[in-house]
Amino acid sequence: MSFEPTFASVSQHQVPDWFHDAKLGIFIHWGLYSVPAFAPNAGELSEILATGAWEKWFANNPYAEWYMNSYRIDGSPTQAYHRAKYGPRFNYAEFGPIFNQAVEQWDPDAWARLFKGVNARYVVLTTKHHDGFLMWPSQTPNPFIRDYHVKRNLVGELGNAVRGQDMRMAYYYSGGIDWTFNPQIVRHITDLQQAVPQRPDYVEYANAHWRELFDQYQTAILWNDIAYPSATNLNELFAEYYNQMPDGLVNNRFTQKFQMDAHGIVSDNHFDFETPEYTSFSEIRAKKWESCRGIGASFGYNAMEGPEQYQSVENLVRSFVDIVSKNGNLLLNIGPMPDGTIPQLQLERLLGLGEWLAVNGEALFDSRPWQVAEGKTDVGIDVRFTQKSDSLYATLLDTPVTTQFVLANLQAAPDTMIRVLGQSAPVTWQQREEGIVVELPVALSSAPAHALQITPQPQRLS
C-alpha cells in the first residue's frame, strides 16, 4: 500500500513479520565517548525510574555516552575525572582525532560474524548520539565544528557486513538532543524538554540525516531517541520512509511533547513499537515492544565497570525468555572500545547467551506469545510460554533437581509428544488433576533455563 503524509494513513502501517520473528537485536553505542570511557558506577536506570531521584542520577550518570553532559556538571565525578585526566581546557571535540585514528583498526566483518554467531537477527548502530558527532561522513556535516565526524564510513561499512550475514541493519539517531546546536546541560529530567533544539536549521539538519539514512543506507528501523523538534511534520517523514521501506519500523521516541512514565518515553505520534529501557513489562502486550539495555549499567564503553556491574549469562537468558513470552524483543547493547574491540566481559556474556540459544533458540525465534506468559511448576521453578505452529514451548527458568515435575494447570491431548530441546532421549508424561507430570529419563544438566516442546498445544486448566 502507499502511505499518505497523515496520521490516519501512517497509522495503518503494520509491524512486519521479520520484527516479530527476530527477537534478538544487537545495539551498539560507539563514538567519541568511547575514548574517555568513564562514568561512575551508580546503578541502573530502572532504579531511578522507580525513585525519581533525577538530579542525583544526572550528576552521577552511569551512562558513559553522556560524558559530554556529565563533565559539564559542577562537582560531578565525571568532571573531576576529566580535569584530572585531560585538564580543564581539553574540549570534548578533541576526542575526535583520537577516535578517528583508533577506528582504522576496526573490522566490520568480524563484528557481523560474531553477531550472526550469537543468533542475533538485527543490529542497531548509533549514528549520532547527543554529542552530535556523526558516525559517517554525511552529506550534511555539522555546521559548527569542522570535521566533526568519523573519516571511515562506519554506517555504510557495518551495514554491508551485517546484511552480508543475512541480518537486518538499522540505525539509531539522537533527534532529541544535539549539544552542538543546543548546549543545554541536563541536570534534571525536566531539562530534557528545554534541551531539544527547535531552531529551523536543526530541523532541516536532523530531517536531512534521517532521509540520508533511509535513502542511502536503507535503515530497517527509524530508531530515534529522546524526542524530536516540534516543527517537523513527522507524518510526512514516516510516509516517505514507509513508501521506500514497507517492512521498516518507527520507534516510539519521536515524541514532540516530551513525556515519560515508569517504562520510559511516551509518544504523542505514530509508532510501531515501544522501547522500555533497562526495564520490561509484566504482562503480554498487544503492542509490539523492544526492551533495550546494556550488558552493564552503561551503553557506551565504561572502563570503570567490573564483573559486579555486568549481568550474568543466567540473568540475560532468563530476562530474554521473559521478554519474548510477553511479545517483546531484546535489543542488547555492546559498548566497544575506540578501535572496535569488544570488552572481554561483554564478549563473554554475549557468547554465553549465544551458546544457550544454539540449543534453545527454537523456543523463542519465530514464536508468538501464548494465551498467558507465565506458568508454575510444583518444584518452585517459574515457566514462560511461547507458541509456534502446533507446539507450545514451556521454558523452565532454572534447572530442576528431580527428574519429575508438574507443569501446573495444563491439560495435554492423549497423543501429546514432549521433548527437551537439545536432548534426544524421550520424555514420558502423564496427566493429573493439577497439570502435566513430566518424567525425564535423566536429570537435566545445570543451565540458565530449559525449553520443553509440547505438541500439540495443551489446554489451560485455569
Report residues per predicted region.
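Mature catalytic domains of secreted/periplasmic carbohydrate-active enzymes
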Residues: 1-462
